[in-house]
Every structure is written in C-alpha cells, then in structure tokens.
Amino acid sequence: METTTKTINGFELLSIAGTVNAIQENPAVAAFELRVENTWVTGGHNQSKIQGFYGACQEDTSRETPFILDNDEPPVLMGNNLGANPAEALLHGMVGCMTTSMVLLAAANGIEVTAVTSR
C-alpha cells in the first residue's frame, strides 16, 4: 500500500508538526548560526560564498557546492551592475523570509495559498 504525504503550499504537514514538537521539547533546536564569507573583487563588486551552517543542534553539510552571490553597485554609485547592491540583497532576504514564513504559517493552519507577492 502506498502512503501519500499531505502537503499544503509545498510544505509537508508532518514535517511542520515534527519541527514544532522538536522545538517545544528542546528549544535549542531553534538556534541557528548562519555563515557567509565575502571577498572584495574590485570597485563596488564583491562576492559572497554561502555553504555550511549550524542548526537543529548539528552542523549542516547538505550543500556540496556553495551558493555564490555577487554584489555590486549601479553606475550612478560607481559600480557595474554585476549584482544587486548590498541593500537590495538585504531587502531580498527580508521579503523572502517574510513570504516563506507567511506561507508556512498558512500551511500549518491548513490554509492553501495560491499566490503571494511581497514588497
């Protein structure tokens, strides 16, 4: 017999419940240490490498290849548009976190979301 996993908004409901229960039993599970290494290239251009992090009481090694992100400035700020500027990258992170949290909370409450745009 095949078992199907119930998902809402792309999240498995059993995983949501398991995560909540794990945090309630051991609040240290919720502590995360995120890391980034940034290297200046030239002018306003720099590059960040993101790979490992500590979370859920363990070191995460699931990323075999690091994420590489470029930051730069627009020409008006003496850059070459080789990437979003650092303030834009920060905004991307904030709205991404807000959007994911909202959709996850909706899923945890059984609410299906069909579309979201955050600004």
Specify the residue positions occupied by each region the protein language model found.
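Aromatic- and glycine-enriched beta-alpha-beta binding-site module
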Residues: 99, 103
